[in-house]
């Protein structure tokens, strides 16, 4: 779990850049509000979770910063910033749909009852709660609404993000480890 959390925490800055782009390029006030609330949760609850988890697992600041990014982590940081730089709402939504949709799908399949250790249990509840479920449904509806106008761009970002997700999990959880 340490390798996963270290690498996952590394793209929070790029993720916030992507959320900022979604706020800036969304075509409705309601969408901007939803993204703003979600960005607030990432900056508070989720970032605080990472810091508490690192402390509980004995992960020092040096252990968080010294290992190089895995290739998929570097790729994720790059694709989030690339999608943001397009100034395309559809591109931002494509990346967000893959990332957040996979978190929700994973969390919904997590074993019940919850693990006793907060490091595992809270990571699940951050990604399986009514607000997060509603946010992922919102992302899907927004991509369905605006994606067709930029279908090639949205599809390109979506497919590349799916490939990065698979590579990310293969890198942090190699077979046999």
Task: Give the location of each predicted region.
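Surface-exposed helix-capping loop/turn segments at secondary-structure junctions
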Residues: 21, 25, 29, 59, ...
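A cross-kingdom marker for long, charged
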Residues: 161-177
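A generic alpha-helix surface/boundary motif
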Residues: 16-17, 48, 74, 137
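Long amphipathic all-alpha helical oligomerization modules
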Residues: 130-159
């Amino acid at each position: 779990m340490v390798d996963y959390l270290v690498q996952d925490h590394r793209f929070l800055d790029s993720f916030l850049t992507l959320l900022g782009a979604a706020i800036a390029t969304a075509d409705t006030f309601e969408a901007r509000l939803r993204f703003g609330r979600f960005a607030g949760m990432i900056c508070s609850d989720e970032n605080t979770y990472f810091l508490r988890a690192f402390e509980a697992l004995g992960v020092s600041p040096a252990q968080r910063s010294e290992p190089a990014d895995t290739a998929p982590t570097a790729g994720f940081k790059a694709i989030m910033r690339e999608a943001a730089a397009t100034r395309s709402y559809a591109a931002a939504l494509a990346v967000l749909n893959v990332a957040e949709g996979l978190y929700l799908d994973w969390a919904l399949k997590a074993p019940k009852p919850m693990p006793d250790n907060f490091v595992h249990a809270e990571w699940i509840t951050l990604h399986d709660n009514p607000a997060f479920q509603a946010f992922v449904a919102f992302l899907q509806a927004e991509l369905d609404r605006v994606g067709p106008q930029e279908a090639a761009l949205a599809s390109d970002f979506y497919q590349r993000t799916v490939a990065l997700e698979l590579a990310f999990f293969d890198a942090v959880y190699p077979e046999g480890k």
